[in-house]
Amino acid sequence: MTDEPKTRVSVRIYGQDYTIVGTESPAHIRLVAAFVDDKMHEFSERNPVLDVPKLAVLTAVNIANEYLKLKEEYDRLAAKLRREKGGEDDD
């Protein structure tokens, strides 16, 4: 459990109001909400027949896919950096 103070921020995602509670700054929470809202609108334009629950799942799956690709790339670069740094120590 964290003792960090919690922030409550009201946001609107795809026409629905939400109160998000978290330890991030209000600006960060709004940025995340705007990102999700933008993605939902983007996928809605490409898939206009989807209802909101299916659209939300499609959006979540696509965001998770983007995240996992970025994490794999980060892990690959971090491992490369460790190898290169380890090589410098051997000189």
From Swiss-Prot:
Q: Which domain of life is it from?
A: Bacteria
Q: Please name the GO terms of the biological process aspect recorded for this protein, alphabetically.
A: division septum assembly; FtsZ-dependent cytokinesis; septin ring assembly
Name the Gene3D superfamilies for this protein: 6.10.250.790
Subcellular locations according to the entry: Cytoplasm
Cellular component (GO) terms are: cell division site; cell septum; cytosol; plasma membrane
**InterPro entries referenced in this protein's UniProt entry, alphabetically:** Bac_CellDiv_Activator (IPR053712), Cell_div_ZapA-like (IPR007838), Cell_div_ZapA-like_sf (IPR036192), Cell_div_ZapA_firmicutes (IPR023688)
Identify the main location: cytoplasm
Which positions are tagged coiled coil? 59-86
Q: Which Pfam families match?
A: ZapA
Assembly mode: Homodimer. Interacts with FtsZ.
Q: What is this protein called?
A: Cell division protein ZapA
